[in-house]
Amino acid sequence: WLAGDEPAAIAIVARRGSAARLAAFALRPAWRGKGLGRKLMQELLMLLQQQGIETVFLEVIRDNHAAVALYQSLGFTRRYGLCGYVSTELLPPVPGVLQLYPTLSLLRRAIEESNSQLPWLLDPLTFATLPCQVVTLEQRAFAVLTTAGSRPVLSFLWVEPAARRQGLARELLMALAQQFPGLGTSVTVPETFTPLFAAAGYTPLSLQQYEMTMDLADA
């Protein structure tokens, strides 16, 4: 959005079929506190609805109470509390425990099962176009490591349905910490997984978010 020739606000939207994610929304400082954020968000949501978008997702920092209140007033509801974790225990590496696995082979299996029930940034579709590698423990538990930065980031865990509730996810997290000291996640993991990460020696990050969603069909 422009005020004359000067940018006043910006929104970045990612699309995935009939769903969209508000990847970024920002106002220049001079335009804040004037009700413009609400007005522009209403315009954006109307535009997305006209383009056939049915559901909109976004993430917001939990402590940003003003932003949370704004999104709630527009009709967004909290879907997940999101946390991040980092491995803090120094464990000696054990070679050969983890093996590489074809990325697309895992994603095809995980996409079929997830059925859009995960947070947007954890949906397996996210990783189909990102630089990443997959490692596996016993060909039953799998981890996606994104490799766009200087060090890998743990971005996704998946255990075969028949192998769940056997401790494999915890074993995989511990093996990852051994092979990649200091490995962490982004703030994209549902907070219900905190006990799992704690049991594997990972510490929660201080930053926390909400994923919020809005059904435009009800708007």
PLM features per residue range, with description:
Residues 6-14, 21-26, 138-158:
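Conserved beta-strand in the GNAT
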Residues 15, 28-30, 34, 62-63, ...:
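Active-site acidic-Proline motif in GNAT/NAT acetyltransferases
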Residues 31, 35-43, 163-175:
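Conserved acetyl-CoA pyrophosphate-binding loop and the N-cap/start of the following alpha-helix
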Residues 48-59, 178-192:
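Conserved GNAT acetyl-CoA-binding A-motif
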Residues 59-61, 72, 77-90, 203-216:
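Conserved catalytic-core motifs of GNAT/GCN5-like acyltransferases
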Residues 74-146:
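Amide-forming acyltransferase catalytic core, primarily the GNAT-like/NAT-type
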Residues 134, 154-166:
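Flexible loop/N-cap segments at domain edges
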